[in-house]
């Protein structure tokens, strides 16, 4: 009998899965192809690399992803432990210093005596034992082909985009200003205001800018949560002003008025030396990014630490293939976790790794699997990806809409969400005593 569990991929989901298995006293072989081989979007040698934004989104219980974070904390998540420790200012959101975060996860994984890290590319599934596939949206070519043949349902393809990062010292703070919307919270964001003329010049250059060639990009299939800014701009001249460039609740101290549009920059590291352009995921050519984004007031001399990039995202038809424990229905010794399952977002990916890891451990120990209830965020997400009634499966962030509803006579949405969250945490605490 194999005395360990295989986990393929040391991203957010894979690290969380390995951690959950190891803390239950079971040996893990964690396979990671870095640093021998990198995907088009990965650059760091460390685990759990954040390739898009450095924000894990809201930390508030009134928001579903805030609830999901708290549920994961209850279940002793390594990802939440490291994210909380590597936090940088971001208002009500949980943003992290991506380098410190990745280093912390890597150190904890490597220090765990139950986890053996193997730096090799896996080209096909192991023939024996329990395996968790957490290879992410950029699964390597050979393994992608093997998995496509193995699951028999084929793959769905789309593309994600990452936003540029600029240095703080290159931002003209005589034009830009720090402020929170409506004066709420701390002034964590840098705001670059635009008048109507500046915005229209910027918009025109953006929609006509030259795009980078993307291999196999033969049709525009994008996920709303990570849509390229130029794609959004092409939907209409005012789309950006009602999206990531909305000016509401902000007053330009130089004019005393609300700007026509505002580009926001969010702190990207602990030192505050780097800021990412919020909502500016892009597939423009790099020289075009420099030219067009320097039209933004305050960024005329911006130094780009990282340009935006476009990369492939691959995921399986989970409702057909998986059950609510992320186990492959036709092969109960195989689990999937992370974005390859169609969950969307850093926290969601890690949560799927948590569920897969817990259940792989239960299988290994000969115990019943854990199906988390739809009344919890972590359970609602696992039920969504395994809902066989879904005919046109698309990636999904966690939200209160997929959770089991209760008859709450509360009209205020935030209060209703908060009560839903409190009920979810109460229910989950009953599971913690059993399965943590």
From Swiss-Prot:
<dbReference type="InterPro" id="IPR020595">
    <property type="entry name" value="MnmG-rel_CS"/>
</dbReference>
<keyword id="KW-0489">Methyltransferase</keyword>
<keyword id="KW-0274">FAD</keyword>
<keyword id="KW-0520">NAD</keyword>
<dbReference type="InterPro" id="IPR004417">
    <property type="entry name" value="TrmFO"/>
</dbReference>
<dbReference type="InterPro" id="IPR002218">
    <property type="entry name" value="MnmG-rel"/>
</dbReference>
<dbReference type="InterPro" id="IPR036188">
    <property type="entry name" value="FAD/NAD-bd_sf"/>
</dbReference>
<keyword id="KW-0819">tRNA processing</keyword>
<dbReference type="GO" id="GO:0047151">
    <property type="term" value="F:tRNA (uracil(54)-C5)-methyltransferase activity, 5,10-methylenetetrahydrofolate-dependent"/>
</dbReference>
<dbReference type="GO" id="GO:0030488">
    <property type="term" value="P:tRNA methylation"/>
</dbReference>
<keyword id="KW-0285">Flavoprotein</keyword>
<dbReference type="GO" id="GO:0050660">
    <property type="term" value="F:flavin adenine dinucleotide binding"/>
</dbReference>
<dbReference type="GO" id="GO:0002098">
    <property type="term" value="P:tRNA wobble uridine modification"/>
</dbReference>
<keyword id="KW-0808">Transferase</keyword>
<feature type="binding site">
    <location>
        <begin position="9"/>
        <end position="14"/>
    </location>
    <ligand>
        <name>FAD</name>
    </ligand>
</feature>
<protein>
    <recommendedName>
        <fullName>Methylenetetrahydrofolate--tRNA-(uracil-5-)-methyltransferase TrmFO</fullName>
        <ecNumber>2.1.1.74</ecNumber>
    </recommendedName>
</protein>
<dbReference type="GO" id="GO:0005829">
    <property type="term" value="C:cytosol"/>
</dbReference>
<comment type="function">
    <text>Catalyzes the folate-dependent formation of 5-methyl-uridine at position 54 (M-5-U54) in all tRNAs.</text>
</comment>
<keyword id="KW-0521">NADP</keyword>
<dbReference type="Pfam" id="PF01134">
    <property type="entry name" value="GIDA"/>
</dbReference>
<dbReference type="InterPro" id="IPR040131">
    <property type="entry name" value="MnmG_N"/>
</dbReference>
<keyword id="KW-0963">Cytoplasm</keyword>
<comment type="similarity">
    <text>Belongs to the MnmG family. TrmFO subfamily.</text>
</comment>
